[in-house]
Amino acid sequence: MFKIQGPILTAMDLDKGSDEILRQADALARSYNVKLSVCHVLPEIFAVRPLFPQLHLDEALKVFDLEAAVRDALLKRIRTVTAREPPRIEIEIEQGTVHAGILRAADNIGAGAVVIGGKVDHGGRHVLGSTAEHVVRYANCPVLVARPSPAGKVLAATDFSDPAFPAIEAGKAEARRRKADLTIIHAIDLLPVLSPFYEEFYGRPPMVFHDQMRTLWQQRLDECVHHYKAKGGGLLRDGPAAPAILSAAAELQAQLLVVGTHGRTGLSRIALGSVAEAVVRAAPCSVLTVRLV
């Protein structure tokens, strides 16, 4: 059973673009009755000057003043968006590279989940920035990439390998929390299953083989839908997994996509070109990644 037990950590800037991220983090923390921590990462501004010790003191005071100003600004924004007050909110100020600071803060507080946002491209689309990409890749806990999303279904992807099932558990828990229907999706891409060189030497697999595999996967999907009581049913799509998942999310106007990062057929890890990363980068809604061991 999927359950977040540690505090929720969210990374926040000092602009209104972080409000949606903060709202989703606050809702997650309230649902699981855990503490909410907000992280802000300052650039590394404390220089090492062994020959001028007085400058160390001056710069330390500047950093102290800056951190105090940032805390005040963050707390004001948090109050406006969530109505939270200390001690119901904790603020973590880190220095250095942004993604490293977020990951460090998550480890320090034993985060149960991290909530981050992406960035908006020139076309107004929400895409995954390099900071979010690093956090999704290396965090030791579930990561919610928060985006403005329609109020549709929760869509959980699976390749039916044992490590992938906790992602469906997470999807079920999120569907219950959001009062939404859960839909489970599996994509049939026969060529990677057979061999990356199969088509080059033998051509496309016979249609009868495709039909047999489709029948087999449909049975497994039906069993999965029944086992997890997925009210939104199951979707079996042909073709590469990432485009199939993204297309289904758009068609269903999904409010959340859930993917695991340790399945066998492309969900094995979040690395360049993998199914999980492609989904996180281009999804039209929020995405929850569940790290599976």
Model segments located where?
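A structural motif corresponding to the C-terminal end of an alpha-helix
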Residues: L74-E90, R220-G233
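Gly/Ser-rich helix-loop-strand patches that form or flank binding pockets
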Residues: I4-G6, L22, A27, S31, ...
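Charged docking surfaces used in two-component/phosphorelay signaling
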Residues: I93-G101, L236-A244
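A short acidic, glycine-rich active-site loop
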Residues: L57-D72, G203-L216
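Conserved beta-strand scaffold positions in the cores of enzyme catalytic domains, especially
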Residues: I91-I93, V143, G234-L236, V287
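Small/aliphatic-rich secondary-structure junction motif
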Residues: M1-E59, A151-M207, A230-L235, A282, ...
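A short, acidic, amphipathic alpha-helical segment used as a generic capping/interface helix at domain edges
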Residues: R220-E223, P240-A250
